[in-house]
């Protein structure tokens, strides 16, 4: 199980990303539309002044049950070993057992 502080940090990043999503998207569109380089630098500076954790690349997918950030399956939202345990216990409909 992941530490609670790491899970809370990830939730904080998700909130920041949602808050600054429209601002980041609009400033990126402005950069592509503006012809002069000096104006592009100004808009880029505004984009750089936003918080680092508001960038979507800083987010991780985490397992719903354990909070593990690695080996996640998008279809289920679970990490590999939890997915395997749930499939073997017949808790996931439509998933078949495999020996791996």
UniProtKB/Swiss-Prot annotation:
GO CC annotations on file: chloroplast; small ribosomal subunit
InterPro entries the record matches: Ribosomal_uS14, Ribosomal_uS14_bac/plastid, Ribosomal_uS14_CS
Coiled coil region boundaries: none
Example GO biological process: translation
Family matches, as PROSITE patterns: RIBOSOMAL_S14
One Gene Ontology molecular-function label: rRNA binding
Subunit structure as annotated in this protein's UniProt entry: Part of the 30S ribosomal subunit.
PANTHER family the UniProt entry points to: 30S RIBOSOMAL PROTEIN S14, SMALL RIBOSOMAL SUBUNIT PROTEIN US14M
Family, similarity comment: Belongs to the universal ribosomal protein uS14 family.
Name of this chain's protein: Small ribosomal subunit protein uS14c
